[in-house]
């Protein structure tokens, strides 16, 4: 059975289970901290949670380590190729933790440059708590998201066996790849289509770049990198005017705001006829953003796994934080209006947004970790 068909079946089963919950007496295990879970094996993850919130995410911040932990999930998970397997070659294990187990190999791959730092930070937690690297990467990414206001409530399943060999190079999309290349890559990895590719890129709402422009570090993709909102989908459609640093770097195009970076792949996917309307659909539509990202993130972290053999430990993931009440879901940054939009969707008009008051928006870099 193809992965997406299997995943859809599991998702339906989960929905039916939830619908019948009122009629079923659920057996739950009580952990030593007094909290209850659906499976006793999940209790151990509360210790992991407390440890990483304090010692990796610095008290639950949506900062540099959170951003890189989310990035690590994608780079570990997408490294799987059924097409290579059909040719008799090893195509990677997907969400199996190979990027941590074989970090000396995989973090040297060009698209993974910079991930060696977060792998180095995460490894001691894996060793301390005796969990598998694949499960830990998936868990840390979800906890990181829970620290970012506006993020969906994430499901978490355990059961990823340790990888036995590194993923091959060339399976992680690059900022300079064409839209065709990236669509083909995600389709090979999990039969994801062009719309689901856009859903994946919602992660850039809480992300920054350290390795595209060597002259500047911690450059965000939008003006609200600490909030999981649709602002990324607004600002990628604004006309680029300048580079935040040296410019002329492979995979970089001009951005609309000082201090903000725009990678070529985001720019082209936002303007491609196959993806532009889905891209625009997230503008000022937080509920769609949350629902679609929740689905695609779970699907990604089960690539290469049998969902039927995994244990649901979603009870351990903290409740997501709401977006601050003083901020709209989407807006034009100060100094920008509808006239700055390079609209590519021909089907529907661009949503009506307000412009924030004040001088032109200048985006601040993501601060380094405390003590760095």
UniProtKB/Swiss-Prot annotation:
Cofactors: Ca(2+); heme b
Record text on cofactor binding: Binds 2 calcium ions per subunit. Binds 1 heme b (iron(II)-protoporphyrin IX) group per subunit.
Disulfide bonds: 31-43, 42-313, 62-148, 277-345
Catalysed reactions listed for this entry: 1-(3,4-dimethoxyphenyl)-2-(2-methoxyphenoxy)propane-1,3-diol + H2O2 = 3,4-dimethoxybenzaldehyde + guaiacol + glycolaldehyde + H2O; 2 (3,4-dimethoxyphenyl)methanol + H2O2 = 2 (3,4-dimethoxyphenyl)methanol radical + 2 H2O
Biological-process GO terms, alphabetical: cellular response to oxidative stress; hydrogen peroxide catabolic process; lignin catabolic process; response to reactive oxygen species
Site, Transition state stabilizer: residue positions: 71
PROSITE patterns the UniProt entry points to: PEROXIDASE_1, PEROXIDASE_2, PEROXIDASE_4
pH dependence: Optimum pH is 3.
Family: Belongs to the peroxidase family. Ligninase subfamily.
Protein name: Ligninase H8
């Amino acid at each position: 059975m193809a992965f997406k068909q299997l995943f859809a079946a599991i998702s339906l089963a989960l929905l039916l289970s939830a619908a019948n919950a009122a009629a079923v007496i659920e057996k739950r295990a009580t952990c030593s901290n007094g909290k209850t879970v659906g499976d006793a094996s999940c209790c151990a993850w509360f210790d992991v949670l407390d440890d990483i919130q304090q010692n990796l995410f610095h008290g639950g911040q949506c900062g540099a380590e959170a951003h890189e932990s989310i990035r690590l999930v994608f780079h570990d998970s997408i490294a799987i190729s059924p097409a290579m397997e059909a040719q008799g070659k090893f195509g990677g294990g997907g969400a199996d933790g190979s990027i941590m187990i074989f970090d000396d190999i995989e973090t040297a791959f060009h698209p993974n440059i910079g991930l060696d730092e977060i792998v180095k930070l995460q490894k001691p937690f894996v060793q301390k708590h005796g969990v598998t690297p694949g499960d830990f990467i998936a868990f840390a990414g979800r906890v990181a998201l829970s620290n970012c206001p506006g993020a969906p409530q994430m499901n978490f399943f355990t059961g990823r066996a340790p990888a036995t060999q590194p993923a091959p190079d060339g399976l992680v999309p690059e900022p300079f790849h064409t839209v065709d290349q990236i669509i083909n890559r995600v389709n090979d990895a999990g039969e994801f289509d062009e719309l689901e590719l856009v859903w994946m890129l919602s992660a850039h709402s809480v992300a920054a770049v350290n390795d595209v422009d060597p002259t500047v570090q911690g450059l965000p993709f939008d003006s609200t990198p600490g909030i999981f909102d649709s602002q990324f989908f607004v600002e990628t459609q604004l006309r680029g005017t300048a580079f935040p640093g040296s410019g002329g770097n492979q995979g970089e195009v001009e951005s609309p705001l000082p201090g903000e970076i725009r990678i070529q792949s985001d720019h082209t996917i936002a303007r491609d006829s196959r993806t532009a309307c889905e891209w625009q659909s997230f503008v000022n539509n937080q509920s769609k953003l949350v629902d679609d990202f929740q689905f695609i993130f779970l699907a990604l972290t089960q690539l290469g796994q049998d969902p039927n053999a995994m244990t649901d430990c979603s009870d351990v993931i903290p409740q997501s934080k709401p977006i601050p009440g003083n901020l709209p879901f989407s807006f034009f940054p100060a100094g920008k209006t509808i006239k700055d939009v390079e609209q590519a969707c021909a089907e529907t008009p661009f949503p009506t947004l307000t412009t924030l008051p004040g001088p032109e928006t200048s985006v601040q870099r993501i601060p380094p970790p405390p003590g760095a």
